[in-house]
């Protein structure tokens, strides 16, 4: 019966055979790859584009993230691209003509120590300076925003306050991917699933196409948007990326009536919690410490995040875990992304988003499309070049990442 519904994803875009050549080939059919294709078509009139996905569309990190959207980052460069992304989020449901349930319910980032308080107040002032909505809340005000949180002083790390971004929130991740895919397909973009890139065609230090499990595809330009497998793709192309891949786990509970009205994050005790539209509690924590490409992780990470969640939200002690899963996040040494040209001519890369990839989806697509179309970075992504790891102009956002990297 579900196959007959008009919103079933098979009816939203075509599944063509790959052509022999394209102006642009985008490797990675997740949110970032699809957003890039959409903005190439919309903003730059480039529609002879193929998005190649090795599995099913948006079946990687796009299907596995915890859907949090915010822009309250510390440094000017980060605030710029994430705030641009948030503004795009606010207009995309109408622009894409698709309701992906973007809910601006606000995000609380908790402070548990005097050090947390000082850093949080600093972050609020920096956000205001950059035009990002931000407030500092006392524990009592935190309780007003989220009535079920425990602000007592009898827990391991008492809540001493929180930063609050009212415009932040969550969205339905699958629907976001489908919305971008549908609109890009309408504009002439080919979306090709079950097509894994196995190598690159090169003429000296210039990329001219890709080798795939469905044949060779020639391309004027190639963009990499493979998230956790970006370093593997870069190695195939003949250069190295300064990233490491780690598993990142999440879990959901059984369904409940609405009890959790906002998003709560705690870097100090490594847990973040929201309630999805259907009613399940969605929780995440820090990355697993080891490197790997497995979409699973160690149980102790789940165990520790559940203990932290129950301490902050005693009511959750009665909840049952429905399922857990993992994604593969690509992290840089400064916890900031790479949206850049590469040492290979006509090859571009978007990676290194770590745990912040979903919230950056529109901004990543917008800036990468500009970089591809003009062969030079947009002002928003110029600071996120590969060269910063040589010059030392790093953008250290470990504190804003909300979980341990």
Curated annotation (Swiss-Prot):
Q: What subcellular compartments does it reside in?
A: Cytoplasm
Self-association state and partner proteins as the record states: Heterotetramer composed of subunits alpha (SoxA), beta (SoxB), gamma (SoxG) and delta (SoxD). May bind to both the delta subunit and the alpha-gamma complex and thereby stabilizes the association of the delta subunit with the alpha-gamma complex.
User: How does the cofactor attach, per the note?
Assistant: Binds 1 FAD per subunit.
> Chief subcellular site?
cytoplasm
Q: Which residues bind FAD?
A: 31-32, 53, 61-62, 66, 68, 197, 354, 357, 359
Task: Give the result of residue 30 to A, as annotated.
Answer: Prevents covalent attachment of FMN. Blocks subunit assembly
Q: Does the keyword Flavoprotein apply?
A: yes
UniProt lineage: Bacteria, Bacillati, Actinomycetota, Actinomycetes, Mycobacteriales
Q: Which family does it belong to?
A: Belongs to the SoxB family.
InterPro entries for the chain: FAD-dep_OxRdtase, FAD/NAD-bd_sf, Rhodanese-like_dom, SoxB
Q: Which domain of life is it from?
A: Bacteria
Q: What is this protein called?
A: Sarcosine oxidase subunit beta
The molecular function GO annotations come to: nucleotide binding; sarcosine oxidase activity
Q: Any idea what job this protein has?
A: In the presence of tetrahydrofolate, catalyzes the oxidative demethylation of sarcosine to yield glycine, 5,10-methylenetetrahydrofolate and hydrogen peroxide. In the absence of tetrahydrofolate, catalyzes the oxidative demethylation of sarcosine to yield glycine, formaldehyde and hydrogen peroxide.
> What start-end ranges are recorded for coiled-coil regions in this protein?
none
In the record, Tele-8alpha-FMN histidine modifications are located at: 173
Q: Which organism encodes this protein?
A: Corynebacterium sp. (strain P-1)
């Amino acid at each position: 019966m579900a196959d007959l519904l008009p919103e079933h994803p098979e009816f939203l875009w075509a599944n063509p055979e790959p052509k022999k050549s394209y102006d642009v080939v985008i490797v990675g059919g997740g949110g970032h790859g699809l957003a890039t294709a959409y903005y190439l078509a919309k903003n730059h009139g480039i529609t002879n584009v193929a998005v190649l996905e090795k599995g099913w569309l948006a079946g990687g990190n796009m299907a596995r993230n915890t859907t949090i959207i915010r822009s309250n980052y510390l440094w000017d460069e980060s605030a710029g691209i994430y705030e641009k992304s948030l503004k795009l989020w606010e207009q995309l449901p109408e622009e894409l003509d698709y309701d992906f349930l973007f809910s601006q319910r606000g995000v609380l980032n908790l402070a548990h120590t005097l050090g947390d308080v000082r850093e949080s107040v600093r972050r609020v002032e920096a956000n205001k300076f950059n035009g990002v909505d931000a407030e500092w809340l006392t524990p009592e005000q935190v309780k007003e925003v989220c009535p079920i949180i425990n602000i007592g002083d009898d827990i391991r790390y008492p809540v001493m306050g929180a930063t609050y971004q009212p415009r932040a929130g969550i969205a339905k991740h699958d629907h976001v991917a489908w919305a971008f895919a549908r609109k890009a397909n309408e504009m002439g973009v080919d979306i090709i699933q079950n097509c894994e890139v196995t190598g690159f065609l090169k003429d000296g230090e210039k990329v001219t196409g890709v080798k795939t499990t469905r044949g060779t595809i020639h391309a004027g330009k190639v963009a990499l948007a493979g998230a956790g497998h970006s370093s593997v793709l870069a190695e195939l192309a003949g250069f190295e990326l300064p990233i490491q891949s780690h598993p990142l786990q999440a879990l959901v509970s059984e369904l409940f009536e609405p009890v959790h009205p906002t998003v709560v994050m705690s870097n100090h005790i490594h847990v973040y919690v929201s309630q999805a539209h259907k009613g399940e509690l969605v929780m995440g924590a820090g990355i697993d410490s080891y490197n790997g490409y497995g979409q699973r992780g160690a149980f102790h990470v789940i165990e520790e995040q559940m203990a932290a969640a129950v301490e902050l939200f005693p009511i959750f002690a009665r909840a049952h875990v429905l399922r857990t899963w993992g994604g593969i996040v690509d992290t840089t040494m400064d916890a900031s992304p790479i949206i850049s040209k590469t040492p290979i001519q006509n090859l571009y890369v978007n990676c290194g988003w770590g745990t912040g990839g979903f919230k950056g989806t529109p901004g990543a697509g917008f800036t990468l499309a500009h970089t591809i179309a003009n062969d030079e970075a947009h002002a928003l992504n110029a600071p996120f070049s590969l060269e910063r790891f040589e010059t030392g102009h790093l953008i250290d956002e470990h504190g804003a990442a909300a979980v341990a990297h």
